[in-house]
């Protein structure tokens, strides 16, 4: 539901001066309710409690692993997070030129879909590991994030180029890696296989970096 002041009511979608409904499902999606109902019925009271505990435990595990390098934006009085955590990425822009978008794109080279970007805090990454992730998978993700942190430090320390680097050029699709032209000061190995475990089950993205704003407006 959306609440507005009385003087704005006539401008709501499909009213006197409003625009057409912008949602493809203006009355909602009943399928979402069926999924939620099935999830609750299959888990039961004990299962729901246990899965919630595991989700919170997983999020706090990642926060403990990454807090000293990235920093955690919000924590409770005990220093813990809920079922998700927000990684601080805003300082990197000043020290290396790297943005939260660069980190999200680089994660694709490690085989991970980008986490929630710049929400609810601009310039951050919000990560929600959920209850189903194994310790091994959490450790792999932690390793990826720490390696990306090291890549940022390489830029800060002058080891990597300020603009032509693995972060700002990420992601690296297969056609780029196997192509004849390679105009980067870093190796194809570092671009495509930044960690040993990546090569074991490499997930290739289809395209290189795109203009996010243009894509949101036109695709």
List PLM regions with ranges.
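Non-catalytic terminal extensions of PLP-dependent enzymes
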Residues: 42-219
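Mobile "lid/hinge" segments at catalytic clefts and subdomain interfaces of large enzymes
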Residues: 1-63, 67
């Amino acid at each position: 539901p959306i609440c507005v002041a009385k003087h704005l009511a006539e401008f709501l979608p499909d009213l006197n001066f409003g625009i057409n409904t912008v949602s493809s499902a203006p009355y909602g999606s009943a399928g979402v309710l069926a999924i939620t109902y099935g999830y609750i019925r299959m888990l039961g009271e004990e299962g729901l409690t246990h899965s919630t505990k595991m989700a919170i435990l997983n999020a706090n595990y990642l926060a403990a692993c990454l807090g000293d390098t990235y920093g955690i934006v919000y924590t409770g009085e005990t220093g813990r997070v809920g079922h998700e955590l927000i990684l601080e990425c805003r300082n990197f822009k000043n020290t290396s030129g790297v943005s939260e978008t660069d980190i999200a794109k680089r994660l694709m080279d490690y085989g991970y879909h980008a986490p929630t970007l710049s929400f609810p805090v601009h310039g951050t990454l919000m990560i929600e590991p959920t209850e189903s992730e194994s310790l091994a998978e959490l450790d792999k993700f932690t390793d990826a994030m720490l390696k990306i942190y090291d890549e940022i430090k390489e830029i800060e320390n002058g080891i990597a180029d300020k603009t032509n680097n693995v972060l700002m050029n990420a992601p690296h699709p297969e056609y780029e890696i196997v192509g004849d032209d390679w105009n980067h000061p870093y190796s194809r190995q570092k671009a495509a296989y930044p960690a040993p475990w990546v090569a074991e089950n490499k997930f290739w993205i289809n395209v290189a970096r795109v203009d996010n704003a243009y894509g949101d407006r036109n695709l």
